[in-house]
UniProtKB/Swiss-Prot annotation:
Pathway assigned in UniProt: Polyol metabolism; glycerol degradation via glycerol kinase pathway; sn-glycerol 3-phosphate from glycerol: step 1/1
Stored NCBIfam families: glycerol_kin, PRK00047.1
Organism per entry: Xylella fastidiosa (strain 9a5c)
Gene assigned in the entry: glpK
Record's protein name: Glycerol kinase
Organism placement in taxonomy: Bacteria, Pseudomonadati, Pseudomonadota, Gammaproteobacteria, Lysobacterales
Binding residues for sn-glycerol 3-phosphate: T13, R83, E84, Y135, D245
């Protein structure tokens, strides 16, 4: 049967999606399922790994039922995932020994503080391109092994397996036959040397993590194994692409040349700039990461990770109950001509790049008796744009490249107010992709290249199209005045301590 589709599994922080793409990179069908968020203590965020797999299986079933396609028409499967989120499971039973610790979770902050005090920061940065922070997988692995009875002993014996979410999904889809990750996900663990391309023994010793639990690291576009699950009606479909969500979005946005950049506005906000085959060391609080491994070559990126972006809109909706639907935020923001002097610094779980302060918490500044709900909502939306400028300033300084345009995707940037304000604050055009699901599309492209569904990156580039281009309209004086207010608000937030 003619292969007509690539299936992308996009496993995110709050939901899982299954998306079918056709030869032109257009969506032929999609299903989505949310799953439960677990908050055992303030600052802790966990998921039940079984809930994640249930959501994946449910979306696959729903997608196939709704589209009524023949499973044999699927050429391959690409997987993209929330990065850093950590699962450890029993190899024999396939059962997790603890909940998945989510990338947002700060429960390993004490471990990070101990490592920093012990002077490991330079070693970690030199080998991984990362910083010592609770964000990354390594300290989460240590926490689980230290807190689950007999876990360390089992790990040493090789009875346990560690994986980021891509690894966990592939293990389950292949019936426990394949324990693998790709370069992009490995580079986010705090355990992988991004220059030597190996799990690093010094880093494993630093965190007392047995090497026996680690997955194999492979190219981001490769045939890793075949599905062994009834959800595909007994068909064995090649799993052929893996990339962490942000690297997948960079690929889906066709940012294949050095200096090209994208920003994804999801739960967090993540800006990546392609730096080619050179790992650019950041001196300005950014991360150096592997973009992907492809055709025997490694390509790198600079990344600025913002912990709270779209989730600030969820907070306005669910926590403060300021509106009923996230999409309502645009109408409220448009009702006022400015932010009324209000700045929201959404450091709910600390501040990411370029500050890297996990100890600070959110703050609001500039409130007066005349402040309205509209001002507050507008200020919260603006915080995403200000944080992006913080990252871009650091990125341009590190890479020595000036950004010509910013390619964007994610739910928050579908808000026209947000997209225009982002362009105004950056003073560069903001391009919104025609296909919003660029993260899933990137995973699909990687799988399609491995299976021959697409022939080359040049073919992929021809598929990329703009939905809208937002050009700067704000004058420089106003732009710098607004940004100066943001910097003041951040400085005050950094100086505040909870008693």
């Amino acid at each position: 049967m003619k292969k007509k589709y690539i299936l992308a599994i996009d496993q995110g922080t709050t939901s899982s999606r299954a998306i079918l793409f056709d030869q032109k990179g257009h969506i032929a069908g999609m299903a989505q399922r949310e799953f439960t968020q677990i908050f055992p203590q303030p600052g802790w965020v966990e998921h039940n790994p079984r809930d994640i797999m249930t959501s994946v299986y449910t979306t696959i079933t729903e997608l196939l039922n709704n589209t009524q396609i023949d499973v044999r028409a699927i050429a391959g499967i690409g997987i993209t995932n929330q990065r850093e989120t950590t699962v450890i499971w029993d190899r024999q039973t396939g059962q997790p020994i603890y909940n998945a610790i989510v990338w947002q979770s700060r429960q390993t902050k004490d471990i990070c503080d101990q490592l920093t005090t012990a002077g490991y920061q330079d070693l970690v940065h030199a080998k991984t391109g990362l910083l010592i922070d609770a964000y990354f997988s390594g300290t989460k692995v240590k926490w689980i092994l230290d807190h689950v009875e007999n876990a360390h002993t089992q790990a040493t014996r090789g009875e346990l397996a560690f994986g980021t979410i891509d690894t966990w999904i592939i293990w389950n889809l292949t019936g426990g036959q394949v324990h693998v990750t790709d370069y992009s996900n490995a580079s986010r663990t705090l355990l992988y040397d991004i220059h030597a391309l190996r799990w690093d023994p010094d880093l494993l010793t630093m965190l007392d993590i047995p090497a026996a639990i680690l997955p194999d690291v492979r190219s981001s576009s490769d045939i890793y194994g075949l599905t062994q699950t009834p959800y595909f009606h007994g068909e064995q479909i090649p799993i052929a692409g893996i990339a962490g969500d942000q690297q997948a979005a960079l690929f889906g946005q066709a940012c294949f040349e050095p200096g090209m950049a994208k920003n994804t506005y999801g739960t967090g906000c993540f800006m990546l700039m392609h730096t080619g085959k050179k790992a650019v060391e950041s001196k300005n609080g950014l991360l150096t990461t592997i973009a992907w491994g492809l055709n025997g070559e490694i390509e790198y990126a600079l990344e600025g990770s913002i912990f709270v972006a779209g989730s600030v809109v969820q907070w306005l909706r669910d926590g403060l109950r300021m509106f009923g639907k996230a999409s309502d935020s645009q109408a409220y923001a448009d009702r006022v001509s400015d932010n009324g002097g209000v700045y929201v610094v959404p450091a709910f779980v600390g501040l990411g790049a370029p500050y890297w302060r996990s100890d600070v918490r959110g703050a609001v500044f500039g409130l007066t008796r005349s402040t309205t709900k509209e001002h507050f909502i507008r200020a919260a939306l603006e915080s995403m744009a200000y944080q992006t400028r913080d990252v871009l300033s650091a990125m341009q300084a590190d890479a020595g490249m000036e950004l010509k345009e910013l390619r964007t995707d994610g739910a928050a940037i579908t808000n026209d107010f947000m997209a225009q304000f982002q362009s105004d604050i950056l003073a560069v055009p903001v391009l919104r992709s025609e296909i919003a699901e660029t993260t899933a599309l990137g995973a699909a492209y990687l799988a399609g290249l491995a299976t021959g569904f697409w022939s080359s990156r040049e073919e992929i580039t021809q598929h990329w199209a703009i939905n809208l281009c937002f050009k700067p309209q704000m004058d420089k004086q106003q732009r710098e005045h607004l940004y100066a207010g943001w910097k003041q608000a951040v400085a005050a937030t950094l100086g505040f301590r909870v008693a």
